[in-house]
């Protein structure tokens, strides 16, 4: 009886988790909004609403803002015009909270998650071929003592360096050609680089 109850609870948890995943259409719109929001952090500089500005923070912020309702109040507070925007997403209340409930490990969830935990507990491995990446996917590097994420935008990557000054907001955009020919080979995304772990996709997105 006890084992049967545990199995039922696990099954229900899986059903709930699956129901919160975005379908193919929602995932496409999520990517479009995610990329657009990330681009604005590059164009305008990091939003005052974006706390903990680093590489993982960019992903957390863009995902959280993507899942919100993008009404006129949101557009104004984020410095967006109403032109050239993706279609709005229809989401359940649970789906809108996905970026507030990251798996932090040890059975805990919350709005904050580190780069390594974002990859380990909240993403799925896609491969090491950059041609497999879709807009919004993450390119993950592990340097041993530190991990780093870049966001694939379709033709280039953007990322936050993890530090900023009065004259440098920390945001960077790098073309694929530049990335593949960097002198510092630790950051080249190919399978000959032991520091390049691979391309990862948020696990609530449809593959």
Task: Kindly give the residue locations of the regions a language model identified.
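Positively charged n-region of N-terminal signal peptides that target proteins for export
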Residues: 1-4
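Residues at the start of alpha-helices and the adjacent loop-to-helix junctions
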Residues: 6, 11, 30, 51-54, ...
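Hydrophobic h-region of N-terminal signal peptides that target proteins for export
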Residues: 9-19
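N-terminal capping segments
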Residues: 17-112
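Active-site scaffold segments
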Residues: 57-61, 149-152, 157-160, 173, ...
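...with weaker cross-activation on analogous glycine-rich loops/strands in unrelated enzymes
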Residues: 81-167
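Low-complexity, Gly/Ser/Thr/Pro-rich intrinsically disordered linker/tail segments
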Residues: 160-163, 170-207
């Amino acid at each position: 009886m006890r084992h049967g109850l545990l199995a039922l609870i696990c099954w229900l948890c899986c059903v709930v988790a699956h129901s919160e995943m975005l379908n193919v259409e929602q995932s496409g719109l999520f990517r479009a909004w995610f990329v657009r929001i990330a681009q604005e952090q590059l164009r305008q500089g990091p939003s005052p609403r974006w706390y903990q500005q680093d590489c993982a923070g960019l992903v957390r912020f863009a995902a959280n803002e993507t899942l919100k309702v993008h009404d006129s109040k949101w557009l104004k507070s984020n410095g967006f015009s109403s032109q050239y925007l993706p279609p709005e997403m229809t989401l359940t209340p649970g789906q809108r909270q996905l970026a507030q409930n990251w798996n932090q490990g040890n059975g805990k969830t919350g709005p904050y998650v580190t780069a390594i935990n974002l990859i380990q507990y909240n993403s799925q491995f896609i491969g090491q071929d950059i041609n497999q990446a879709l807009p919004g996917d993450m390119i993950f590097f592990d340097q041993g003592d530190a991990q780093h994420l870049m966001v694939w935008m379709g033709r280039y990557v953007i990322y936050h360096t993890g530090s900023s000054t009065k004259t440098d907001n920390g945001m960077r955009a790098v073309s694929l050609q530049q990335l593949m020919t960097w002198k510092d080979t630790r950051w080249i995304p190919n399978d000959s680089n032991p520091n390049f772990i691979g391309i990862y996709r948020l696990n609530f997105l449809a593959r």
